[in-house]
């Protein structure tokens, strides 16, 4: 065994092999892959996975990863045998609700470049004559199919690049990982130690056990899953090819099927979650079949077999041969766990990755390791998304189990998890409960979505043109309409406590921050700037505001959900041995947004301060007193109205709320929830990171070029932006209004021009002040001119839309600045 390596990869399943393969293709050498079992039938989930590959996913990144996986597997073979069979897939509908859901999923697939179509019951039977005639239809995706993951892993290991760069050590168990000063130093096995700066854990169901070696609680959980194969089926007796039938999903009954020569494989999620602890997994030496396979539990498969017989009549009462409970991983949010952990430099994970995405994950992990950038937007799966409460054992148990049980459910994009809840409460929470707030959870915070106490305003405003009736009416209330309109007419109180607040101070803080941001920070004390933080390629990594509190002291404000992601990025750029202090002070500060035309009247009354533009200009800050509470006020608004963000110590939060709320009614200012917050920001054209803003687009494409100052000293991404400007824009973020009054879509729908998908919806809502349905999406510049006509495909129907000049509301920003 080598005693030193550039990188040690733990686990020789499909993810580990794919990453090693792609690193070798990028020119890396001195790569070690350690596997506790044999090569390549390792005994992990790769070894028993049925191999079904469905590329449709609500997440663009997950869909792209599966598409990359299909490309990879399709170009691999082992001893003349393919590693992928592109037989297509059918997602079957047996209920009207599922049929409608499939229309939506077809749209999502088209958005992300898939060949997705709805086929009739007759066409379903042409693809698979074994199916029942009672089905209502199916979504057919041409390039889905069956992957042979073990075959693919071995094929990659046989490549010249891998043979020259990678050493595999089978039957070798990792016993410990050593760190020095928070950095990876070496890895210890039962056959010796290897010194290395980088450890990548691709250990799958053993991932949490590896994480414990560096004191990280990986938020994933393993579950047993029932899978069986039938005896030979008479109707398939002449099928000698490995697979010819499209793979099947019967999501109404939480089942899937695959043909394998003359038999059928059947998998069922239609049973209670059966969790398995990583520390309880058997060793290879004592496992009956494999460490990732447990004894079949027929009681959990009874309903599945009844449902299988109803869908495929020839399966009724058929005998089963191969029967297992295979073990594989689920996470708390359904996404894999990728990236370098902030807690330990050099410790990386690529865990909870299914066969469907493994090839693509290996590719982006290699790029991430080699270049510091995965090449696509990975924020949904980045390890930096996890908050401390996400790492709690009880939280992991509940959320991962829920994701197992709901894996094939119809999930509305606004649907909330029922548990665990009430993890983080703002100091205003009890007051919000008294106002009958409808709460949603975001990053652990309970946030008002709307307030039932505002229902009385439905009599004030005519909302008949705005009422929703379909899918878009779920998880929504017309109260959001009046909260929007009342904010525009008078004002609203917004709970901003979940915002992430980061304090940066110390010698060199200005120079440091100015280097990692695109805007110019060297402004007078008290100024507030909006800026992006960029990757070296010019993509938008973060967007946030920075307030200069003193010469070398700054307050960075970021969103709540991605705040730790932004904090990690900022900290990762800090020079070694720097005197700069970066502290997350989020829990110590509460915040209220007081926004709307009468916000100045309210705040001047309760503070006694002159808040006029001459005394308190837009994008500036001051300390003010509200009922003897010292507050930091920032004149900035995320809804496009005159207003201030008011920050005060959390301990004074309830007093702050009472002081503001008790006087607000006199001015017609009401508490407002997130639903109206969203429609207000979209109407104003404000971007949301993760929707409009991501590492895949630069600030000019995103429409935030005003936050870039190319004439300042060097900053991260500057050279890339100069090059982007030289080449010119190919795609831009466009504002599109729907021609039909009252029309609303929900997001991720394809944008169609002359029957061709040219983009997809990043955000959508109704603009109640401009009386238009609004969507945003990236489209090629040749279609992005004002007046350009497009269609939005929503549940199989085409909604006509027009590219419009933005912002739609208050284009001259007069309401913000006066």
Predicted regions: what they are:
Residues 377-818:
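Glycine/proline-enriched, intrinsically flexible loops and inter-domain linkers
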Residues 139-198:
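Helical element adjacent to the flavin cofactor pocket in flavoenzyme catalytic cores
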Residues 5-32:
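N-terminal Rossmann-like FAD-binding beta1-loop-alpha1 element of flavoenzymes
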Residues 18, 54, 177-295, 303-311, ...:
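Flavin-dependent oxidoreductases
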Residues 50-127, 252-257, 261-265, 291-292, ...:
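Dinucleotide-binding Rossmann-like beta1-alpha1 core, especially the glycine-rich loop
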Residues 64-67, 91-101, 140-158, 169, ...:
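Short beta-strand to alpha-helix junction loop
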Residues 252, 275-279, 287-424:
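C-terminal catalytic lobe of FAD-dependent flavoproteins
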Residues 24-46:
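Glycine-rich FAD pyrophosphate-binding loop
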């Amino acid at each position: 065994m080598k005693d030193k390596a550039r990188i040690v990869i733990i686990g020789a399943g499909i993810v580990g092999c794919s990453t090693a393969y792609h690193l070798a293709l990028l020119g890396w050498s001195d790569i070690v892959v350690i596997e506790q079992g044999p090569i390549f039938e390792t005994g992990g989930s790769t070894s028993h996975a049925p191999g079904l590959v469905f590329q449709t996913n609500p997440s663009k990144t997950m869909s792209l990863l599966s598409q990359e996986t299909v490309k990879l597997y399709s170009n691999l073979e082992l001893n003349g045998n393919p590693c992928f069979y592109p037989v297509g897939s059918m997602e079957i509908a047996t209920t009207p609700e599922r049929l409608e859901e499939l229309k939506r999923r077809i749209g999502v697939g088209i958005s992300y470049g898939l060949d997705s179509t709805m086929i009739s019951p007759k066409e379903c039977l042409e693809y698979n004559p074994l199916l029942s005639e009672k089905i209502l239809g199916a979504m057919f995706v041409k390039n889905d199919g069956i992957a042979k993951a073990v075959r693919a892993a071995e094929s990659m290991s046989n490549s010249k690049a891998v043979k020259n760069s990678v050493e595999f050590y089978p039957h070798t168990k990792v016993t410990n990982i050593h760190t020095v000063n928070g950095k990876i130093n070496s890895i210890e096995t039962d056959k010796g130690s290897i010194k290395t700066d980088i450890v990548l854990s691709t250990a799958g169901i053993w991932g949490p056990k590896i994480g414990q070696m560096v004191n990280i609680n990986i938020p994933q959980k393993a579950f047993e899953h029932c899978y069986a194969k039938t005896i030979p089926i008479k109707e398939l007796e002449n099928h000698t090819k490995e697979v010819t039938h499209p793979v099947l999903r019967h999501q109404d009954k939480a089942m899937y099927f695959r043909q394998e020569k003359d038999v059928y494989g059947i998998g069922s999620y239609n049973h209670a979650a059966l969790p398995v602890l990583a520390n309880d997994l058997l060793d290879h030496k004592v496992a009956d079949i494999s460490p990732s396979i447990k004894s079949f539990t027929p009681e959990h498969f009874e309903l599945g077999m009844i449902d299988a017989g109803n869908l495929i009549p020839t399966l009724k009462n058929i005998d089963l041969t191969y029967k297992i409970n295979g073990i594989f991983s689920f996470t708390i949010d359904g996404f894999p766990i990728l990236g370098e952990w902030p807690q330990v430099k050099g410790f990386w994970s690529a865990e909870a990755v299914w066969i469907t995405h493994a090839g693509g994950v290996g590719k982006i992990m290699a790029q991430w390791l080699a270049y510091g950038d995965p090449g696509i937007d990975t924020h949904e799966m980045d390890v930096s998304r996890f908050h401390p409460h996400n790492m709690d054992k009880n939280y992991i148990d509940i959320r991962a189990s829920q994701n197992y049980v709901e894996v094939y459910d119809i999930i509305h994009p606004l649907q909330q998890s029922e548990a665990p809840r009430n993890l983080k409460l703002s100091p205003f929470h009890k007051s919000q409960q008294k106002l009958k707030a409808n709460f949603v959870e975001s990053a652990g915070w309970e946030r008002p979505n709307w307030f039932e106490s505002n229902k009385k305003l439905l009599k004030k405003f005519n909302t008949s043109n705005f009422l929703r009736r379909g899918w878009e009416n779920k998880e929504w209330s017309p109260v959001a309409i009046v909260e929007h309109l009342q904010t525009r007419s008078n004002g609203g109180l917004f709970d901003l406590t979940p915002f992430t607040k980061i304090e940066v101070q110390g010698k060199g803080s200005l120079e440091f921050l100015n280097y990692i941001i695109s805007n110019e920070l060297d402004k007078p004390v008290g100024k507030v700037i909006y800026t992006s933080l960029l990757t070296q390629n010019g993509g938008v990594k973060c967007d946030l505001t920075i307030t200069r509190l003193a010469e070398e002291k700054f307050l960075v404000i970021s969103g709540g959900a991605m705040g730790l992601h932004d904090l990690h990025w900022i900290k990762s750029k800090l020079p070694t041995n720097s005197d700069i202090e970066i502290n997350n002070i989020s829990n110590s500060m509460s915040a209220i947004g007081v926004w709307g035309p009468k916000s100045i009247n309210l705040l001047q009354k309760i503070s006694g301060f002159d808040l006029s533009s001459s005394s308190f200009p837009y994008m500036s800050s001051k300390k003010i007193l509200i009922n003897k509470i010292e507050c930091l006020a920032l004149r900035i608004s995320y809804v496009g109205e005159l207003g201030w963000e008011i920050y005060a110590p959390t301990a004074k939060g309830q007093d702050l709320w009472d002081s503001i709320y008790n006087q607000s009614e006199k001015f017609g200012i009401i508490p407002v929830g997130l639903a109206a917050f969203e429609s207000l920001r979209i109407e104003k054209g404000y971007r949301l990171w993760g929707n409009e803003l991501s590492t895949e687009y630069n600030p000019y494409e995103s429409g935030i070029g005003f936050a870039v100052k190319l004439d300042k000293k060097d900053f991260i991404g500057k050279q890339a932006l100069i090059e982007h400007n030289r080449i010119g824009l190919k795609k831009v973020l466009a504002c599109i209004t729907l021609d039909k009054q009252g029309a609303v879509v929900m997001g991720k729908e394809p944008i169609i021009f002359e029957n061709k998908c040219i983009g997809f919806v990043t955000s959508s809502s109704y603009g109640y002040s401009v009386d238009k349905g609004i969507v945003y999406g990236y489209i090629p510049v040749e279609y992005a001119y004002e007046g350009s006509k497009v269609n939005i495909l929503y549940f199989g129907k085409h909604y006509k839309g027009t590219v419009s000049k933005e912002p739609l509301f208050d284009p001259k920003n007069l309401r913000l600045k006066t």
